[in-house]
């Protein structure tokens, strides 16, 4: 099995410090919106759900495939529960967006390029989250995905009693033609939140790979990790992400039965070039200690060159986001599950610990 590593999917954005105050998520300075402030203050008093606009501060990217980041600092005196995500973006502007939960942001600057996967860039860059700061993915969006509401009673805990002290928004601007005339962008997400405690805490596990796809061939990029924590996960939503070569992305819970045979329960399977929103999982059966979570991306190349995993449209990605909740206690310490990918790691490797693999099902819709 591959080691768990905190490899964040390629990242980037311009940064704007804001504050989630005891009266609600209110940004400081010129970006503060009095209407939002009024709504948040009144809703906070009643314990109802309020909405906070976490948006790019009218940025104008001038470099193709630029990743920009912007943060908000969560009020450390109050615990909040995020219960919904309403994107404010279109695929004509933003290739994708990620929302990170961090102990500290990747830099003390108010704005930065967070595209650290882009080795070709000469610009100074930093990760979305600081080192050893409990980096985790909370939410992801691409290809005109619609609003996501969490199940009743479920929420992402941030603030006082959570390791998430900052939220960092990342936007990947793949194409910048529309900004050449000085136009600006405020892509982002409206966060629905409440101070009313949620017993069911939400978490997101990001599974993905490194690797490469040979020219003019179909390749499988695969990963799998074992749950080694005494927790019961209730999966409820999943999201897939590739670039242009992705054909099918599938995810499974793998459990060994009393006869020693592995049973593969499908969690989700999609064409990654359809709207990359969070969909209901195929099954909601619990995931327990000792289970494995396995993901395959079936990639088909018509290019006359090798395509590597990387941040740009000329590269590829293989990502599967699994959203779950726990009934008791905290969410998984494991936030990421990555492998080396092809040509080094495959489910069928003798040391993977996997057998009874549904090869055909995992690669067909």
UniProtKB/Swiss-Prot annotation:
Field pH dependence: Optimum pH is 5.0.
Residues of this chain annotated as glycosylated in UniProt: 88, 280
Induction: Transcriptionally regulated by DIMM.
Effect of gene knockout: Death as late embryos with morphological defects that resemble those of animals with mutations in genes of the ecdysone-inducible regulatory circuit. Amidated peptides are largely absent but peptide precursors, a nonamidated neuropeptide, nonpeptide transmitters, and other peptide biosynthetic enzymes are detected.
A GO molecular function held by the record: peptidylglycine monooxygenase activity
E.C. code: 1.14.17.3
Cellular component GO terms held in the UniProt record: extracellular region; extracellular space; membrane
Binding-site list for Cu cation A: 95-96, 172
Tissues where the protein occurs: Expressed in the central nervous system (CNS) in a small number of CNS neurons (approximately a few hundred). Expression is present both in cell bodies and within neuropil regions. It is strongly expressed in neuroendocrine neurons (at protein level).
Family: Belongs to the copper type II ascorbate-dependent monooxygenase family.
Protein name: Peptidylglycine alpha-hydroxylating monooxygenase
Species annotation: Drosophila melanogaster (Fruit fly)
Gene symbol of the encoding locus: Phm
């Amino acid at each position: 099995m591959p080691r768990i590593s905190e490899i964040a999917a390629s990242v980037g954005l311009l940064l704007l410090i804001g504050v989630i105050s005891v009266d609600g998520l209110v940004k400081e300075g010129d970006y503060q919106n009095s209407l939002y402030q009024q709504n948040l203050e009144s809703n906070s008093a009643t314990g109802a759900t309020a909405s906070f606009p976490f948006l790019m501060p009218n940025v104008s990217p001038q470099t193709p495939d630029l990743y920009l980041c912007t943060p908000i600092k969560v009020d450390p005196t109050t615990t909040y529960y995020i219960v919904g995500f309403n994107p404010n973006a279109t695929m004509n502007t933003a290739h994708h967006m990620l929302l990170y939960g961090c102990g500290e942001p990747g830099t003390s600057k108010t704005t930065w390029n967070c595209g650290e996967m882009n080795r070709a860039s000469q610009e100074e860059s930093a990760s979305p989250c600081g080192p050893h700061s409990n980096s985790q993915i909370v939410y992801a969006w691409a290809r005109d995905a619609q609003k996501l509401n969490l199940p009743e009673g479920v929420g992402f805990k941030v603030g006082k009693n959570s390791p998430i002290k900052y939220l960092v928004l990342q936007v990947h601007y793949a194409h910048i033609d529309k900004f050449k005339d000085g136009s600006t962008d405020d892509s982002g997400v409206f966060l629905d939140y409440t101070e009313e405690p949620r017993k069911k805490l939400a978490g997101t596990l990001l599974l993905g790979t490194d690797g490469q796809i040979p020219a003019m061939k179909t390749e499988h990029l695969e990963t799998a990790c074992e749950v080694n924590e005494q927790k019961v996960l209730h999966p409820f939503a999943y999201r897939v992400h590739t670039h242009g070569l992705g054909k099918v992305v599938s995810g499974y819970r793998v459990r060994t039965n009393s006869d020693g045979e592995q049973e593969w329960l499908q969690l989700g399977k999609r064409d990654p070039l359809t709207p990359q929103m969070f969909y209901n999982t195929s099954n909601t059966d619990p995931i327990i200690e000792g289970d494995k979570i396995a993901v395959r991306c079936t990639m088909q190349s018509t290019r006359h060159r090798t395509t590597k995993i990387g941040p740009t449209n000329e590269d590829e990605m293989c990502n599967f986001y699994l959203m779950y909740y726990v009934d008791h206690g905290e969410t998984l310490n494991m936030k990421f599950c990555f492998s080396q990918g092809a040509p080094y790691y495959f489910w069928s490797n003798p040391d993977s610990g996997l057998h009874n693999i549904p090869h055909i099902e995992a690669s067909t819709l």
